Amino acid sequence: MVAAKKHVPIVKKRSKGFMRHQSDRFMRVDSAWRKPKGIDNRVRRRFRGTLAMPSIGYGSNKKTRHMMPSGHKAFLVSNVKDVELLLMHNKTYAAEIAHNVSSRKRIEIIARAKQLSVKVTNAKAKVTTEV
């Protein structure tokens, strides 16, 4: 495996998820974020002490956006030909094998990635080795 290219430190401005208004009060209201649209809504009006709303200011650095802790960006791979696309970009991108790839094809993909020194994020998934 090739180490990732040098980059600025990855900084997440907020790791806590944004909660939907009153999702803590009612079971029927899911916690997944929805923008409040009511005319009197205190979250929409940004009252002090209410839930934070997602905004552009929480976005991460453009250089480190979508970057994994290893410093690579994920690239979805479905066959051996896709792995060969990463030959020149193995310091920037890491291969991630798609969920619908069979275990036989996975073994071929992993072998080719090793030859090209491409990092595979989920190399151990769905690959059984006999004991």
Swiss-Prot record:
Domain of life: Eukaryota
BP terms from Gene Ontology: translation
InterPro entries on file: Ribosomal_eL32 (IPR001515), Ribosomal_eL32_CS (IPR018263), Ribosomal_eL32_sf (IPR036351)
GO cellular component, one term: cytosolic large ribosomal subunit
Main location group: cytoplasm
SUPFAM superfamilies assigned: Ribosomal protein L32e
Record key words, sorted: Cytoplasm, Ribonucleoprotein, Ribosomal protein
SMART domains for this protein: Ribosomal_L32e
Compartments in which it is found: Cytoplasm
CDD domains named among the record's database cross-references: Ribosomal_L32_L32e
A molecular-function term among this protein's GO annotations: structural constituent of ribosome
Protein purpose: Component of the ribosome, a large ribonucleoprotein complex responsible for the synthesis of proteins in the cell. The small ribosomal subunit (SSU) binds messenger RNAs (mRNAs) and translates the encoded message by selecting cognate aminoacyl-transfer RNA (tRNA) molecules. The large subunit (LSU) contains the ribosomal catalytic site termed the peptidyl transferase center (PTC), which catalyzes the formation of peptide bonds, thereby polymerizing the amino acids delivered by tRNAs into a polypeptide chain.
Protein family according to the UniProt entry: Belongs to the eukaryotic ribosomal protein eL32 family.
Subunit structure: Component of the large ribosomal subunit (LSU). Mature N.crassa ribosomes consist of a small (40S) and a large (60S) subunit. The 40S small subunit contains 1 molecule of ribosomal RNA (18S rRNA) and at least 32 different proteins. The large 60S subunit contains 3 rRNA molecules (26S, 5.8S and 5S rRNA) and at least 42 different proteins.
Protein name: Large ribosomal subunit protein eL32
Organism of provenance: Neurospora crassa (strain ATCC 24698 / 74-OR23-1A / CBS 708.71 / DSM 1257 / FGSC 987)
